[in-house]
Amino acid sequence: KCFEVGEFCGSPMLLGSLCCYPGWCFFVCVG
């Protein structure tokens, strides 16, 4: 899972987490 900005994630994350798409985390997914 992705919790920190700049962390890499390889799969879509759940609502409320820092990523909603594969890649680098830069925002919180809200919808």
Swiss-Prot record:
<dbReference type="GO" id="GO:0005576">
    <property type="term" value="C:extracellular region"/>
</dbReference>
<feature type="disulfide bond">
    <location>
        <begin position="9"/>
        <end position="25"/>
    </location>
</feature>
<keyword id="KW-1015">Disulfide bond</keyword>
<keyword id="KW-0960">Knottin</keyword>
<protein>
    <recommendedName>
        <fullName>Conotoxin pc6d</fullName>
    </recommendedName>
</protein>
<comment type="similarity">
    <text>Belongs to the conotoxin O1 superfamily.</text>
</comment>
<keyword id="KW-0964">Secreted</keyword>
<keyword id="KW-0800">Toxin</keyword>
<feature type="disulfide bond">
    <location>
        <begin position="19"/>
        <end position="29"/>
    </location>
</feature>
<feature type="disulfide bond">
    <location>
        <begin position="2"/>
        <end position="20"/>
    </location>
</feature>
<dbReference type="GO" id="GO:0090729">
    <property type="term" value="F:toxin activity"/>
</dbReference>
